[in-house]
């Protein structure tokens, strides 16, 4: 029986509708964790003043490029900027790992007939979290590098790596073997994987543009809303990819 996109979309929407509360709670919970971690690890107010102390000089050199801007910073400003970047990256990474592990375990538990919740699914994913952490870190670096060089390589890498988290969790395989298997399956079924990945990327961009226009004064609330909606889109993609992999494996 051929695998069609319509069948995958229908199965994905059916599962999402039936488990919407758990998926929504997991998306918001991981978004909250991301925002709290970012806030806890970010530079203090005194350190942030170091960045703004010579803001007029820095703002006048923005047009010259990011690298020139960084080079014109003092060592203290560069340290604060690095700390801010590291805090945001680590917080987002932890949130993505918890979301990925939780959603994939939720699908498995529900498919096996178990009643579960967002917290229980995340707890059940504990044995895979460290492996997922290194996998998602590697995938994120590769995709962002591809996006920096040119958008198309980044999209192609996102397609190639899309099934690797599913393979790591379901097959309990290693990181590189999962990436190899994912690349082969993803490009072997490009009609099923490419549209989903492109739609996911466009949806995340649209969410960023829309939410940034909302009249929300609290940065914390804005961060939770933005990350929560982005996580919800990612959760739906994971459900789609899990269903696709199950059909391919069968």
From Swiss-Prot:
Q: Localized where?
A: Cell inner membrane
Q: Transmembrane ranges? A: 20-40, 90-110, 132-152, 156-176, 192-212, 222-242
Disulphide bridges in this chain? Answer: none
User: What's the family?
Assistant: Belongs to the UPF0259 family.
The record's InterPro entries line, in alphabetical order, gives: UPF0259
Q: Which organism does this sequence originate in?
A: Pectobacterium carotovorum subsp. carotovorum (strain PC1)
Could you tell me what this protein is called? UPF0259 membrane protein PC1_1998
Please give the superkingdom of this protein's source: Bacteria
Sorted alphabetically, the Gene Ontology cellular component annotations on this record are: plasma membrane
The record's keywords, sorted A to Z, are: Cell inner membrane, Cell membrane, Membrane, Transmembrane, Transmembrane helix
The topology of this chain with respect to the membrane is: Multi-pass membrane protein
